[in-house]
């Protein structure tokens, strides 16, 4: 990929248009783990075409803002999780089970009732469509095996390690197809590594490496505390982060704008590119470019610029679109300021 120093990207999601989703439904619940079809305002017969239009708008916003590595904004998803996680064989999503979320709330999740298998591509058309919208490098996200295991009720395997391995194999098959059709960067979303650090230390690196086995080109992993809309009070540090140095993933995406994070922890990832969260998504206030630049400079005290990518803290799904666009413009300009300061091309 031909990218400038301190390139910019999104973690994944961007606000969906009001004509596509019912924001009262979307904002009235947490991210769904099973299907939430009632969120869509468009009839099923017209939904794919409407989602295509939403992707066009999202990519146009990202390109106009100057984002170097756009996504499709996850316009087709009810959550980062459920589009892929409910498309696998071996699951009952119509009679879901219950587990406790990382916030301690009961949440409905797929029941594992047979062998987990990916029998068909899930996101291939999404990537093909995104690839046709821009000549810039593109990124696509898939929920990781560890997180999918924590958001499922196992009634088949009886062993968490075997369940993780089955999910990882399904993710691996999907990622290979996504790379084949043009995804430049593939990202695993693994928020539950942070939420379950003891179990993550036992299974996390294996889950990542198995999912990424044989994947060529840049790979990323997003590790977060949860959407700012859902999680109001974020901890001051990651319970699982330096452990990722032992994994095969190339890029590690962290929150660094909203939480009061000591960025010295980044020194524990000497072989990784760090996707530094530089936009606070808990506020609708649009940062100035200088505020963003200050957050980037703080990261550069611990990571060389050649190993830094700049992004929002997390997905932007729950923001108003005008706010999200303004924040992306500030992100790009803030990266440009720092790039100029350190002698990179503006």
Kindly label every feature range from the protein language model:
Residues 1-346:
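Domain-level signal for soluble alpha/beta catalytic cores
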């Amino acid at each position: 990929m031909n990218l400038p120093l301190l390139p910019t990207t999104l973690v994944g999601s961007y606000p969906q248009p009001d004509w596509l989703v019912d924001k009262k439904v979307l904002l009235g619940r947490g991210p769904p783990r099973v299907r939430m079809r009632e969120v869509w305002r468009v009839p099923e017969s017209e939904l794919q075409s409407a989602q295509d239009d939403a992707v066009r708008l999202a990519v146009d916003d990202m390109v106009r803002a100057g984002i170097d590595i756009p996504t499709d904004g996850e316009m087709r998803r009810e959550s980062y999780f459920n589009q892929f996680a409910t498309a696998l064989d071996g699951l009952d999503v119509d009679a879901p089970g219950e587990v406790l979320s990382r916030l301690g709330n009961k949440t409905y999740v797929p029941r594992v009732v047979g062998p987990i298998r990916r029998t068909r591509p899930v996101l291939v058309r999404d990537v093909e469509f995104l690839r046709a919208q821009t000549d810039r490098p593109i990124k696509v996200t898939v929920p990781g095996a560890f997180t999918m295991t924590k958001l499922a009720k196992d009634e088949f395997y009886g062993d968490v390690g075997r369940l993780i391995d089955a999910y990882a194999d399904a993710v691996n098959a999907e990622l290979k197809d996504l790379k084949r059709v043009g995804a430049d960067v593939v990202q695993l979303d693994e928020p539950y590594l942070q939420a379950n650090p003891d179990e993550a230390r036992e299974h996390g690196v294996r889950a990542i490496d198995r999912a990424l086995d044989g994947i060529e080109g840049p790979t990323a992993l997003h590790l977060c505390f949860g959407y700012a809309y859902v999680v109001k009070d974020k901890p001051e540090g990651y319970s699982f982060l330096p452990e990722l140095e032992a994994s095969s993933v190339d890029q590690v995406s962290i929150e660094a704008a909203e939480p009061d994070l000591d960025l010295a922890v980044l020194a524990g990832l000497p072989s990784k590119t760090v996707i530094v969260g530089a936009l606070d998504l808990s506020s609708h206030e649009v940062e100035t470019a200088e505020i963003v630049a200050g957050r980037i400079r703080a990261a550069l005290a611990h990571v060389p610029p050649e190993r830094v990518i700049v992004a929002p803290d997390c997905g932007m799904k729950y923001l108003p679109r005008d706010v999200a666009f303004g924040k992306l413009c500030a992100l790009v300009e803030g990266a440009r300021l720092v790039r100029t300061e350190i002698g990179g091309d503006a």
